Amino acid sequence: PEESDDTVMQYHRHHAPLWETCCNRVMEVPVLRRGEIMEMEHSQAFFEIANPRLAGTLVPVFSLRSEGSYGVGDFGDLRVMIDWVAYTGQRVLQILPINDTTVTHTWKDSYPYSCISIFALHPQYVDFRQLPALKDKKKAAEFEALREKLNALRQIDYERVNKAKREYLRLIFAQEGQKVLASTEFKRWFAEEQHWLVPYAQYCVLRDINGTADFSQWKDHRTWNEEDRNSLVSSRSKAYKEASYHYFVQFILARQMQAAHEYARQKHVILKGDIPIGVNRHGCDVWQEPRYFNLNGKAGAPPDPFSAKGQNWGFPTYNWDAMIADGCRWWVRRFQNMQKYFDAYRIDHVLGFFRIWEIPVESVHGLLGQFQPSLGFTRAEIESYGLMFREDFFCRPYITEEVLSQMFGDRAEQIAHTYFEPFQGPYLRFQKEYDTQCKIKEKVEDADIREALYSLVSDVLFLRDHKRPDLYHPRISVQYDYIYHQLSEADKAAFNRLYDDYFYHRNTHFWYREAMKKLPRLIEATRMLVCAEDLGMVPDCVPWVINDLKILSLELQSMP
């Protein structure tokens, strides 16, 4: 018998041959005559899997201002950053979301995680240096003078920059638009992108005509109508004239970003994108396909050491039943669109694919949220923990004169008269005009009183399920509130057992199954490397899914 190890030769002077890591192979070799050759095929080879250690940088594109920028980092500056990453021996460049976030045309739109379209790119990232020069010399000089002023600022003036860029793009469109829209390259691109581009363009036009992105307030076209598509794509129609400006801008953005992506590949730099968990509730995505969203709730996060009252992001939550019914088409398209610009991506708040913290629309803080989906308790289940269920007591804000006295001191009587009314026995309840946090936010000017009233609204032991009123969820962090301290020691112990079971055990396998309905479809949609941001209140099932699907997780050595 003969023994052998397979080897792979690397034809590079710095690399040694790679040898198999398995035991030597034992083979029976017949006697061969001179000149005879025998070939043997092995079905498996055992080589060490490469375990590279790659360094990278995370940066928002808007911060990449260079000498030639127009007051904000753009896709041309991204190429400069790619050069620096490659020069320093790094391999990964991650950027924050670059989708359009334009709702009000003010600085409030500057938050990159509140996109109005999962496809459209933000017009502020257009690199004017890659466009034809303005033929109007006077206008060109004016814009150059403004560019120098905006670029000299220590911080980005979001409103002035975006106003100037919109005006410049309008002039370029008037100058070059007809030629670009008639080009073969544009027509080919438009055919591939029009499924989202046409509704997006109409949404932008209607947003500006109506002076608001809240489509529920528009005079007409409060949802996308597929019958409008024909007029929006016909160059002979009135609707096309204004919509085509947005086609033109998105075409420029797509070409510049794709060029930056290709440049990164040439430099052997992995360009990594960022997919926000939510979308703006007044954005084009919700307007075009409202069936995919729950508008009677807001996404957020439960309390943590950095946010004692939880977080309210304001995004609508997803109607996963509708999304799963059509194979998660909305998400698959989103990921496939990302693949045009990136080689890897970060899933923001991957916990949202297991369950999302859903907050009532009338809430400001996150304490009144509940996980959706999740397994709420029936009355019988609650009582099985040893806690006699009293709905009127457990599900109403606990407010008495004694509570107000502890919170407001000498002002308690005035507060009681202004905001409350008698209810049952010693209890008070909010007057109708102050019975939600949003009403309080709108009507109460004093910040201290406002925050105190917020806390009283959320002073409940249980929350009714948002979909099934016969089910109940324990209110998170209620152990710090007045209602909890009215319980007997036995009831506190019973509630704590129920509380720990609900948040840390009861839903674990249920949430695992929920994630596995969604994430495999999305990961298989592209060849991009998947990374997950899995910080927060992480259930035990999250590492199971992350490991099963070979998703890279976020590992931190330390946190402040």
Predicted regions, residues:
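Intrinsic disorder/low-complexity segments
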Residues: 1-4, 19
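Short hydrophobic alpha-helical segments enriched in small aliphatic residues
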Residues: 13-16
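Targeting/processing segments of secretory and organellar proteins
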Residues: 3-10, 347
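Catalytic cores of glycan-processing enzymes that make or break glycosidic bonds
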Residues: 19, 23, 28-560
